[in-house]
Every structure is written in structure tokens, then in C-alpha cells.
């Protein structure tokens, strides 16, 4: 669970509030030595939506490890889009990029097959309901993701995606998530290119760039994150509709922030944070103090 005290100005208007932001229940275990399952339900999301019956349940899958090299997953899971901000659990993210904020659903029903080259290298093919679908189960996304490690200090979540929107048009995502570690310092660099199949400027005209830095000092984390997103105003079809329905043509967006995290009882139980961030769209300035805690209710071995 995470709760936060916010002090914020948006377009010059002051707002103060204390709110619960995340309350999740995790259930995980094994049906057999080769089949595991996981459920993560978020009580902080609308639990039932006529367009999305399992809206409150982010994760609900079974995973079959068929062999040392192959595994197969069925159920509801994250749409495999590369990038470390997108991949992080929402409870661990204090402020998001516009892409992550605007995408309709990051978790959908589908199936995937993974080939494990080694413990740190896997290639995953996934077909699932589209993250751009407003509850229409006949819209799909086709995803290929590499979870890898190029060097001992360089890990990756890279993906190529073909995603169908409400108008049944496809957009391509090419996303490179990179995680670097050096001693107690960690750096994430995410690069995403988006383009419609008939878009004139396929590269570098509709993008997201994100950088996050963490320096772990004892039970403390010193953190900073910034992002820059843009979509050229010319990225529209002849009828005026946008190729990208998540980041509108003509968008140029900057956000940045920094903060401290403190883990008083080790790094897996309680986390206290103080974070400031701002953005260029709503001229938001937000300072927050908060606490996150995890409790094991039942553990069986």
C-alpha cells in the first residue's frame, strides 16, 4: 500500500490533499513444479467497468515452464512494451511520462511464448488485447520483446510492437529500455519511437526519451528522473486523424523531478519518500511525502 501527502500548484492554482494511491493484493504460488500462477488486484482502481470487467485486476495468469528453454504464459499480464518506466510496478513510480499516463490499459488478456537462451536472456512473443482498446476484445497487439543482458552492467527490455487502435489502424512502437548499474549507482535510459505504417517521417518525429538515476547510500536512495516527449504536428493522415492516439500531434512535453527514499527496516518492507516534480504542460509543481509498505499475510512452503 502507498499513501501520500501532496502539496501542488497547477496552472497557478494551489491544492493540498492526503490520499491513498495504491492498495494491492498479491496471490502467487505453484500448481505443480512446472506451473506457477500470480494474481495482483488493485483496490485503488475501479474494480468493475462495463467495458473492462477485470479492470481492477492487473495480473492474473498461469505460467507453464515446459522445458529449460521454453515457457508459456496465459491470462492477464503487462503488454510487453519495452522500457523501464513502463515495466516498473505502478506502486514504485511517483510520476509518469505522458505516454504511460495516456495509454488506456497497460495490462490485458493474452498469451505469450518465451525462449530462454540463458538465465539472463529471453525472447518473448506475445499476442494480446490492444492497450489502445476501450474494452473492445477484438483489437489486438502483437509484441516481440527481448529481456536481456548485454554486459554485466547493462540490462535491456527492448521491444517491437504492432498495436491496433479503436479505428483499427496499426501503429508501430520500437522501444529500447536500458538499465545500467555501477556499484551503488543505477541509470535507466528509455527510448521509444512511434509511427503509423504510412507515416512519412517514420523515425524521430514521434518519440519519448526518459532518464532515471538512483544512487543507493545505505538505507537511502537519492533519485532523479526526467523525460522529453514530442510528436510532430504533421503526423496526421489525409483525413486529419492522428497516427498516434496516445501522444497527440503537436505535443512537446517535458517533465522532471528528484527525491529521496528511506528504507528504515530493510529494502523490502517499508519505504518513506519525499519527491518533487514539475511538468511543462500544466505547469505543475508537486511536492509529496509518502509511505509504502508491504506485508505478508499468509506464507506457505
Task: Describe each model-derived feature in a short phrase.
Residues 1-6, 13-130, 138, 147-150, ...:
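Outer membrane beta-barrel
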Residues 4-14, 32, 49-50, 61, ...:
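Outer-membrane beta-barrel pore domains
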Residues 122-170:
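Loop-centered beta-sheet repeat module
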